């Protein structure tokens, strides 16, 4: 067993991504998951997929944390210091930016409530496939929008690498990909709502 070269990524660089190669590696039958030839483990794949019901709320919570950090940073910069970056006025006095703050806060709160519900259902032994997928999809969308808007609100300073905003914006994108892409989570939710799934809505 060996690892190939570590990939250079857009974001989440503190976590390495690489391919693990199992060369001439024999796996004991008892360790095989999801093999259709082995009745004992034929449900293994479904079991692995079911873990997403637990991990998607965790990923959603992480995404919300990044979005919250970006919003708080911009608020502190503009409100406490009154940085004049657009139109010759302190940006916190501009109505357009007030609307931005309202929208960012509302979207983060909505994503957080979805995530709380998905986690609460998991903790109480309830099936949360629908809620976990909604929370993850919503949080991934929101963190991307919030971090991008945060960069815009600080103008050239926000785009510079001397602030953490550009890092948070890069880190945010992974939330559209891992633990199921946005399209996968949207498909899960849509099929449950439209009745394609054999399970009833929660």
Give each language-model segment a name.
Residues 33-34, 38-58, 71-106, 116-134, ...:
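Glycine-rich cofactor-pocket loops
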Residues 148-153:
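Short segments within alpha-helical structural elements
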Residues 154-202:
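Glycine-rich phosphate/cofactor-binding loops in nucleotide/flavin-utilizing enzymes
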Residues 13-14, 144, 168-170:
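A structural signal for short secondary-structure junctions
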Residues 136-138, 173:
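A general lysine-centric signal
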Residues 22, 118-119, 139:
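A structural signal for short, well-ordered beta-strand segments
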Residues 64-71, 101-111, 115, 139-147:
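Alpha-helical transition-metal enzyme core signature, strongest for iron centers
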Residues 1-72, 184-186, 192-202:
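FAD-binding core of flavoproteins
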């Amino acid at each position: 067993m060996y690892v190939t070269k570590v990939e250079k990524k857009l974001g989440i660089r503190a976590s390495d991504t690489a391919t693990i190669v199992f060369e001439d590696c024999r796996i004991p039958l008892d360790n095989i998951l999801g093999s259709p030839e082995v009745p004992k483990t034929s449900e293994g794949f479904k079991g692995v997929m079911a873990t997403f019901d637990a991990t998607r709320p965790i990923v959603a919570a992480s995404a919300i944390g990044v979005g919250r950090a970006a919003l708080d940073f911009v608020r502190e910069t503009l409100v406490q210091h009154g940085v004049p970056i657009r139109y010759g006025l302190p940006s916190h006095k501009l109505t357009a930016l007030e609307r931005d703050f309202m929208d960012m806060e509302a979207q983060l709160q909505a994503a957080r409530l979805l995530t709380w519900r998905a986690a609460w259902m998991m903790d109480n032994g309830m099936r949360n496939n629908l809620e976990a997928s909604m929370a993850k999809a919503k949080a991934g969308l929101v963190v991307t929008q919030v971090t991008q808007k945060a960069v815009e609100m600080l103008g050239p300073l926000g785009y510079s690498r001397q602030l953490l905003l550009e890092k948070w914006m890069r880190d945010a994108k992974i939330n559209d990909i891992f633990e199921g892409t946005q399209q996968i989570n949207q498909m899960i939710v849509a099929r449950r709502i439209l009745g394609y799934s054999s399970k009833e809505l929660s």
